[in-house]
Amino acid sequence: NNRKVNDSPDVSANRPFLQACEPDYKDIIANATLRRRMSRIVKMGVACGLECMGELSPEKIGGIITATGLGCLVDTEKFLNNLLDNEERMLNPTPFIQSTFNTIGAQIALIHQIHAYNMTYVHRGLSFESALLDAMMKIEEGSENILVGAMDEMTETSYIIQQRLGLLKGIEAGEGAQFFLLSREAGEHPLAEIRGLETFTGQHTTEEISSRIIRFLQRNGLECQDIQWLVTGKNKKQSIQGDYHEQITNSIYEELQNNLFTESIQLSFK
């Protein structure tokens, strides 16, 4: 099962980034006091997770695994601003408590009284992949259902800082939350079956990456020509001139597209 809160992102000309369209949280998070104490990203993530669970009994959830690249930015910014404004004295601890990255998974567990495995991954670009790998291992160990999701928010301050550092070249910044319910057995309306997952980081040549991809596919009984869709993190060419790292990354994607997956439909997502 899968739910997301950014089906129709707000692309208002007043904002330089995509902003998630949020649901009416009163319909999902009934406790008004709890809802008021939640920051925007916490409400977004908790609502998405609760919707994904649907009518599934909390006792059947074997774990809640969440992932985020940057965490609760609004609360983090609020706490740091208070720190500066009050010269490190008389600080309200609430923004700090709410800014911890495991808040969303913890709130879902508290609302439904789920006394099970609860983990949060903050590995920047590898956060969701790490959470998904953990969920798959929990399923292999015997868990029947694992709730796994990822969420990130974008703020004006964060956007300006990332833009000045050159981190948004060729990227259309955005935000959102997504949750998936992984099950050992297919339910009535399964979206897909996960056959395999592999991650590798560090500096690798195109040949090394190609070899690992080929071996990964072969372990799952597939060849490159069997892949119908190829999704990469390729950036816009016109936006990365002068950025050596991004040019190298794009050249690797292009090599894979032109040599390994010539028969695949290709698209990029960033």
Residue ranges of model-derived segments:
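Short aromatic-hydrophobic micro-motifs that form the base-stacking/packing surface
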Residues: 147
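Conserved "HGTGT" condensation-loop signature of ketosynthase/thiolase-family condensing enzymes
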Residues: 1-117, 122-129, 137-143, 151-270
